[in-house]
UniProtKB/Swiss-Prot annotation:
The keyword Zinc-finger does not apply. Belongs to the FARP (FMRFamide related peptide) family. The modification Phenylalanine amide is found at F45, F113. The modification Leucine amide is found at L158. RFamide 1: Expressed in corpora cardiaca (CC), corpora allata (CA), antennal lobe (AL) and gnathal ganglion (GNG) (at protein level). Expression in AL detected in most animals, in CC, CA and in GNG in some animals (at protein level). RFamide precursor-related peptide 2: Expressed in corpora cardiaca (CC), corpora allata (CA), antennal lobe (AL) and gnathal ganglion (GNG) (at protein level). Expression in AL detected in some animals, expression in CC, CA and GNG in few animals (at protein level). The keyword Signal applies. GO terms for cellular component: extracellular region. It comes from Agrotis ipsilon. It is found in: Secreted. This is FMRFamide-related peptides. It comes from the Eukaryota. Keywords: Amidation, Cleavage on pair of basic residues, Neuropeptide, Secreted, Signal. Residues 161-190 are annotated as: Disordered.
């Protein structure tokens, strides 16, 4: 009798566990609404796959920023692009148009971090034809003449320029030092 009770108890326990472990079937609409509500309330970390890129997106991704003068910031890696034949044709046509038109303006300085040109770099470009940029530039900083080394002309000057300083200004007389010293100040000693 105790054996049959044990078997009956195990069968009942097995049925309860089996019933609770199987999920309840829901309608597809209800399930879709539940999933979209969860998706809206969650913060996702990780990669998301964007919709198919357009030809303009592909053109923008493949353009060389130093050629067109575009400025951009990119941190990390972007998703790989999937190209269709229409996108490739429009991309090739855009490149033909870019290389047929003469370049009117180049920028001698750009921003890049790291060695790869896809990243941001701070400082001057490593182009060999820097002289072309310096000759074409019409930079005049507050009336100063342009010098051979023009890097200083691109910054704001604070104080006196080294070309204006006279050697006579460094020679001070004893009287001018005494005027500025704290020893001659009567209010300071009290």
């Amino acid at each position: 009798m105790s054996c049959s009770r044990t078997v009956a108890l195990l069968a009942a326990l097995w049925l309860v566990v089996g019933a609770t472990s199987s999920p309840v079937r829901r309608s597809p609409d209800l399930e879709a609404r539940r999933r979209s509500a969860i998706d809206r309330s969650m913060i996702r970390f990780g990669r998301s796959y964007p919709p198919e890129p357009s030809a303009a997106d592909i053109r923008e991704a493949f353009e060389r920023p130093t050629r067109r003068g575009n400025s951009f910031l990119r941190f990390g890696r972007s998703q790989p692009l999937t190209l269709s034949t229409d996108d490739l044709v429009s991309l090739l046509r855009a490149y033909e148009e870019d290389y047929d038109t003469p370049m009117t303006k180049k920028s001698a300085s750009f921003v890049r971090f790291g060695r790869d040109p896809n990243f941001i770099r701070l400082g001057r470009s490593a182009d060999d034809d820097k002289s072309a940029f310096e000759q074409n530039s019409e930079l005049v900083v507050s009336g100063y003449p342009q010098r051979k080394s023009r890097a200083r002309d691109h910054f704001i000057r604070l104080g006196r320029d080294s070309e204006e300083v006279n050697e006579n200004e460094f020679e001070e007389t004893e009287e001018s030092r005494r005027k500025r010293s704290a020893d001659s100040c009567h209010d300071c000693q009290s």
